[in-house]
């Protein structure tokens, strides 16, 4: 049995989207159970529409809901211990749930997750990983916004975290990993990226196939299973891709409605356009995963519909079922056992920074 905690108040639509999504997933996954947190007067009416959902879920009233415009510090100060978001994360820490899903404020969710779950022993900072549609299927891209700027050690952490996710979600025994750079040549790029590349080449990990540097267009091509970058570049790449997808969709709609012949052509090509729309739909790959924490937290898009939120739940379900955390911890232990200098140099950097 896999138990998923749900922040029912998160996102633009709250329980009106969240509760139908739970019913969808419960139908597909008979071994799933839900622990739902939210405001009773808003959640109960939605739950009443799906009587069978009561058989596989528990509901707990929370008076406070974190707003989408709350600053992380405000959300942590006012929502700790009593908000639906905090309770959903706390359920993972206590063992009441195996994973947490929320469509709420990203900054607040990350702040609460870090405060409540803490990072893994050898991880400096967590990362947000996204599933990215590609010509070959999907890739894991991280970090897409948690850490602005990252040193070589943190990029290696991200590579190991992303590898664990790819193994859990894609079922690939040895995922290919690439470092996002301004060129594929080893002499190009920032020193942190070049140093991370050197260390990954020398690591020779059984669970990871280091490909080398990749460029921006390699993400969509699906050149590698895991693309590693720091959060500033990753977030810009993600938002650019989402905007480009919407732009292309707009172009197609305009072109297909311009003339009578275009409209007739659309009727005959509708199935092809539907497949294209499905491939470009962000909702199909909905869910940013907070990696590097002592627990699984999935952030759904705030504007996701019920199908999109269901996709985020199923992503969390798959990672629990495929032992994501155990895989990551084993990979981290193996890397540091083979590269003890990496951890010692990191500790010395921390000491130096403290002295400065």
UniProtKB/Swiss-Prot annotation:
Listed GO biological process terms: fatty acid biosynthetic process; phospholipid biosynthetic process
Any one cellular-component term (Gene Ontology): cytoplasm
Entry's localization field: Cytoplasm
Gene Ontology MF annotations: phosphate:acyl-[acyl carrier protein] acyltransferase activity
InterPro entries on file: FA_synthesis, Phospholipid_synth_PlsX-like
Location, primary (coarse class): cytoplasm
Catalytic reactions of this protein: a fatty acyl-[ACP] + phosphate = an acyl phosphate + holo-[ACP]
Pfam families according to UniProt: FA_synthesis (PF02504)
UniProt keywords, alphabetically: Cytoplasm, Lipid biosynthesis, Lipid metabolism, Phospholipid biosynthesis, Phospholipid metabolism, Transferase
Top-level taxon: Bacteria
Enzyme class: transferase
EC number: 2.3.1.274
Pathway involvement of the protein, from the record: Lipid metabolism; phospholipid metabolism
Membrane-traversing stretches: none
Similarity annotation: Belongs to the PlsX family.
Quaternary structure and interacting proteins, as annotated: Homodimer. Probably interacts with PlsY.
Job of this protein: Catalyzes the reversible formation of acyl-phosphate (acyl-PO(4)) from acyl-[acyl-carrier-protein] (acyl-ACP). This enzyme utilizes acyl-ACP as fatty acyl donor, but not acyl-CoA.
PANTHER family, per database record: FATTY ACID/PHOSPHOLIPID SYNTHESIS PROTEIN PLSX (PTHR30100), PHOSPHATE ACYLTRANSFERASE (PTHR30100:SF1)
Entry protein name: Phosphate acyltransferase
Source organism per UniProt: Mesorhizobium japonicum (strain LMG 29417 / CECT 9101 / MAFF 303099)
Gene that this polypeptide is encoded by: plsX
